[in-house]
């Protein structure tokens, strides 16, 4: 069996990125640039392929903790931390956009942020996006973390944080790991309870976005608020 010929330098991911831009590279090639080197018997691009296959694609890979990544033979602390940093940079880019823009006027940006923050999580998390009077992001804070099927959310904690940050409005988002993005009866009841609690301090609940993998559902758009 003949082995594949080595890539010409002009075909290396770094050289192609410099000539044609990052968008021309495949996912394994982009990962190869982040990883910089491969491991024994496996170059960086092959390692990228292997990681995507092992963890079920980019979302699964980038949602994996550094400790879980280090289980891969040859993938040490440095490479695992680089991959974790890549996801965090992507999330912070979207967060930066929310600081600058009206969240109500940019529902797609909100949806993408929620998906980036929660789509890969393996247990339920609930996050609150606290907004100022111009509906720009003040701070994003985790308000609950639970199990595979539920997270206990306390309206009083959300109200307290809204007062502390002088918020005028907020958006909630939580994930359904391994499920669908459809709002359950419990989701609807809790959301309305939180909306009523916030109304007492004159804070608007604009939306509650449910995330399941790549799917998102706006409870406001579905008439549940």
Swiss-Prot record:
<dbReference type="InterPro" id="IPR010994">
    <property type="entry name" value="RuvA_2-like"/>
</dbReference>
<dbReference type="Pfam" id="PF20582">
    <property type="entry name" value="UPF0758_N"/>
</dbReference>
<dbReference type="InterPro" id="IPR037518">
    <property type="entry name" value="MPN"/>
</dbReference>
<protein>
    <recommendedName>
        <fullName>UPF0758 protein BP1235</fullName>
    </recommendedName>
</protein>
<feature type="domain" description="MPN">
    <location>
        <begin position="103"/>
        <end position="225"/>
    </location>
</feature>
<dbReference type="GO" id="GO:0006508">
    <property type="term" value="P:proteolysis"/>
</dbReference>
<feature type="binding site">
    <location>
        <position position="187"/>
    </location>
    <ligand>
        <name>Zn(2+)</name>
    </ligand>
</feature>
<keyword id="KW-0378">Hydrolase</keyword>
<feature type="short sequence motif" description="JAMM motif">
    <location>
        <begin position="174"/>
        <end position="187"/>
    </location>
</feature>
<dbReference type="GO" id="GO:0008237">
    <property type="term" value="F:metallopeptidase activity"/>
</dbReference>
<dbReference type="InterPro" id="IPR001405">
    <property type="entry name" value="UPF0758"/>
</dbReference>
<feature type="binding site">
    <location>
        <position position="176"/>
    </location>
    <ligand>
        <name>Zn(2+)</name>
    </ligand>
</feature>
<comment type="similarity">
    <text>Belongs to the UPF0758 family.</text>
</comment>
<feature type="binding site">
    <location>
        <position position="174"/>
    </location>
    <ligand>
        <name>Zn(2+)</name>
    </ligand>
</feature>
<dbReference type="Pfam" id="PF04002">
    <property type="entry name" value="RadC"/>
</dbReference>
<keyword id="KW-0645">Protease</keyword>
<dbReference type="GO" id="GO:0046872">
    <property type="term" value="F:metal ion binding"/>
</dbReference>
<keyword id="KW-0482">Metalloprotease</keyword>
<dbReference type="InterPro" id="IPR046778">
    <property type="entry name" value="UPF0758_N"/>
</dbReference>
<keyword id="KW-0862">Zinc</keyword>
<dbReference type="InterPro" id="IPR025657">
    <property type="entry name" value="RadC_JAB"/>
</dbReference>
<keyword id="KW-0479">Metal-binding</keyword>
């Amino acid at each position: 069996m003949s082995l594949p010929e080595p890539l010409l330098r002009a075909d290396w991911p770094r050289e192609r990125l410099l000539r044609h831009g990052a968008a021309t590279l495949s996912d394994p090639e982009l990962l190869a640039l982040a990883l910089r080197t491969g491991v024994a018997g496996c170059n960086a691009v092959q390692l990228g392929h292997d990681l995507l296959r092992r963890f079920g694609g980019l979302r699964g890979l980038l949602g994996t903790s550094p400790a879980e990544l280090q289980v891969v033979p040859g993938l040490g602390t440095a490479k695992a931390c680089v991959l974790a940093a890549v996801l965090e940079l992507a999330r912070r880019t979207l967060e930066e956009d929310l600081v600058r823009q009206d969240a109500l006027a940019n529902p797609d940006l909100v949806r993408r942020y929620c998906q980036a923050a929660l789509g890969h999580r393996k247990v339920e998390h609930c996050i609150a996006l606290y907004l100022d009077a111009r509906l720009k992001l003040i701070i994003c804070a985790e308000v609950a973390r639970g199990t595979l099927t539920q997270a206990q959310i306390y309206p009083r904690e959300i109200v307290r944080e809204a007062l502390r940050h002088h918020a005028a409005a907020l958006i909630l988002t939580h994930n359904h790991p391994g499920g669908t993005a459809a709002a359950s009866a419990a989701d609807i009841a809790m959301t309305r309870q939180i909306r009523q609690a916030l109304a007492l301090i004159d804070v608007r609940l604009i939306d509650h976005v449910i995330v399941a993998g790549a799917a998102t559902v706006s409870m406001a758009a579905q008439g549940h608020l």
